[in-house]
């Protein structure tokens, strides 16, 4: 009899849970329609892989790219809709979150064609690679819209787990295994630190997990200026710092960049920073609203260290991927300036604008590196000497992307940095802006050093890699060149017409 009653209670409880989940999906599912498209694409990939042979490989690329493009289209159709909180407060949709989701989808869409020939040449498993990329994209999108502490923790873990697997995808490469181990250990440690910071927020607010409810809880408990909030701020800053990889949380970045497959590095170098920037902006501005002076100081220190160390150490590098790793550390220092400035002086708009340009500049550079690596098998900077004599198109494309990263006019990178630094100057961050200007000059030096090598390498300097350089057939590499051309154009032309981009970025602010 007791067993019968317990069984009935279990059935009733299960039914209630199922009905609640069905109700949430029915009424809130439209708010995550772009994410649902990616989930459907993942299911299709698994179905095709389990029921087909190697001849259907083009379909895998087609489904991946189509699901990403359809997700972008769904986001654009939802633009300027009223902000809404769904799934019992776990997820928020507004223009600010959606523009970061758009940037993540754009990165992934450009990375798929960039990876095609690399996967074929290295004979990596194609389906798993695409699954990890789409799943990481999905995790990044959920992180951008996360509205409570649990989702903010689970979403980046989804992204991180796929990142660990992607970085160690070439299992026979010792450097790849080393990079994965460092990435995994430091990622696990940073996640633990982040959760510890969340626990302080949870306890101080009286058991609240939603971001806005945490603020209300801190007011009710009079804990908004307590030492516990300062402890939470420090731990959360360290945890998020791993995702953003500013100095001194950058130790994993050079090794992972050097050891991972180049298309994976291209994907991680932009998507992780976009998702982490969106999350950091909301966490610092909502739960830590009363501690703005403290987190401003912390971020200023991180920005200064990142801009100085990243650009100075990049000068000494001999590997192109390690150089870009340290360059990205310096670039995140510039982005942090926009986070500090905030909404009052167009700081977020300048950050979004610069990130859009950074995506095109960085992915364009990596597309050139992928092509050069496939044709020569090397990543050493000195092996690029005299590339212009063998492949002028590739050399000019790489030069334009590097000049844009350095911030030379009239390229997009110059206007992005100019807008970012101008907003910082208006907000009174004079010291940060001066450091940014000086370190930008340093970055121009090591970019120009590479460009000089590309264009003017003397015969005695040209290594056998370039001397024996052979262009592969156009049919096999046009997907990489397509991504490269799109990124090169986006790195140059938008600088001339900045106003529409800035207007869209300003329109996205919460």
From Swiss-Prot:
Membrane topology: Multi-pass membrane protein
Intracellular or extracellular location(s): Plastid, Chloroplast thylakoid membrane
Top-level class of the enzyme under EC nomenclature: translocase
Signal sequence, start to end: none
Keywords noted in UniProt: Chloroplast, Membrane, NAD, NADP, Plastid, Plastoquinone, Quinone, Thylakoid, Translocase, Transmembrane, Transmembrane helix, Transport
Entry GO CC: chloroplast thylakoid membrane
Positions of transmembrane segments: 24-44, 57-77, 99-119, 124-144, 149-169, 183-203, 227-247, 295-315, 323-343, 354-374, 395-415, 418-438, 484-504
Cited InterPro entries: NADH-Q_OxRdtase_suN/2, ND/Mrp_TM, Ndh2_N
EC number: 7.1.1.-
Protein origin, superkingdom: Eukaryota
Gene Ontology terms describing biological process: ATP synthesis coupled electron transport; photosynthesis, light reaction
Subunit: NDH is composed of at least 16 different subunits, 5 of which are encoded in the nucleus.
Family, similarity comment: Belongs to the complex I subunit 2 family.
Function description: NDH shuttles electrons from NAD(P)H:plastoquinone, via FMN and iron-sulfur (Fe-S) centers, to quinones in the photosynthetic chain and possibly in a chloroplast respiratory chain. The immediate electron acceptor for the enzyme in this species is believed to be plastoquinone. Couples the redox reaction to proton translocation, and thus conserves the redox energy in a proton gradient.
UniProt name for this protein: NAD(P)H-quinone oxidoreductase subunit 2 A, chloroplastic
Source organism of this protein record: Solanum lycopersicum
Taxon lineage: Eukaryota, Viridiplantae, Streptophyta, Embryophyta, Tracheophyta
Gene that produces this protein: ndhB1
């Amino acid at each position: 009899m007791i067993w019968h009653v317990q069984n009935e209670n279990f059935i009733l409880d299960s039914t209630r849970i199922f009905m609640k989940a069905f109700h949430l999906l029915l009424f809130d599912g439209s708010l995550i329609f772009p994410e649902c498209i990616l989930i459907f694409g993942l299911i299709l990939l698994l179905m095709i892989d389990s029921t087909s042979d190697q001849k259907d490989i083009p379909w895998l690329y087609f489904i991946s790219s189509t699901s990403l493009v359809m997700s972008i289209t769904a986001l654009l159709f939802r633009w300027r809709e009223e902000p809404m909180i769904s799934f019992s407060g776990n997820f928020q949709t507004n223009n600010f979150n959606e523009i970061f989701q758009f940037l993540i989808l754009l990165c992934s869409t450009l990375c798929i064609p960039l990876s095609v020939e690399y996967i074929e040449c290295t004979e990596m498993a194609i389906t798993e690679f695409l699954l990890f990329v789409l799943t990481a994209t999905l995790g990044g999108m959920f992180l951008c819209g996360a509205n409570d502490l649990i989702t903010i923790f689970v979403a980046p873990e989804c992204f991180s787990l796929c990142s660990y697997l992607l970085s160690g995808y070439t299992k026979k490469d010792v450097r790849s295994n080393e990079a994965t181990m460092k990435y995994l250990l430091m990622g696990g440690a940073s996640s633990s630190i982040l959760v510890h910071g969340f626990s302080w927020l949870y306890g101080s607010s009286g058991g609240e997990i939603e971001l806005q409810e945490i603020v209300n809880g801190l007011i009710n408990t009079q804990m908004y200026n307590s030492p516990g909030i300062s402890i939470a701020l420090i731990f959360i800053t360290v945890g998020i710092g791993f995702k953003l990889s500013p100095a001194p949380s950058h130790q994993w970045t050079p090794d992972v960049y050097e050891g991972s497959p180049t298309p994976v590095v291209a994907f991680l170098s932009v998507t992780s920073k976009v998702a982490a920037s969106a999350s950091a902006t909301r966490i610092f501005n909502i739960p830590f609203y009363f501690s703005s002076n403290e987190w401003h100081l912390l971020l200023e220190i991180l920005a200064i260290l990142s801009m100085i160390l990243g650009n100075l150490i990049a000068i000494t590098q001999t590997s192109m991927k390690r150089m870009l790793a340290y360059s990205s550390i310096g670039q995140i220092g510039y982005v942090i300036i926009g986070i500090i400035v905030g909404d009052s002086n167009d700081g977020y708009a300048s950050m979004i604008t610069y990130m859009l340009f950074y995506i095109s500049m960085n992915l364009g550079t990596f597309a050139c590196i992928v092509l050069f690596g496939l044709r020569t098998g090397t990543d050493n900077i000195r092996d690029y000497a005299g590339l212009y004599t063998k492949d002028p198109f590739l050399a000019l494309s790489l030069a334009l992307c590097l000049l844009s990263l350095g911030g030379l006019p009239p390229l997009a990178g110059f206007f992005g940095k100019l807008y970012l630094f101008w907003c910082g100057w208006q907000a009174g961050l004079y010291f940060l802006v001066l450091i940014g200007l000086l370190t930008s000059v340093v970055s121009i030096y090591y970019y120009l050093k590479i460009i000089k090598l590309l264009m003017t390498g003397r015969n005695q300097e040209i290594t056998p890699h370039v001397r024996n350089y052979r262009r592969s057939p156009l049919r096999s590499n046009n997907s990489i060149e397509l991504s490269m051309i799109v990124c090169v154009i986006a790195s140059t032309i938008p600088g001339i017409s900045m106003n529409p981009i800035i207007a869209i970025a300003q329109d996205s602010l919460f």
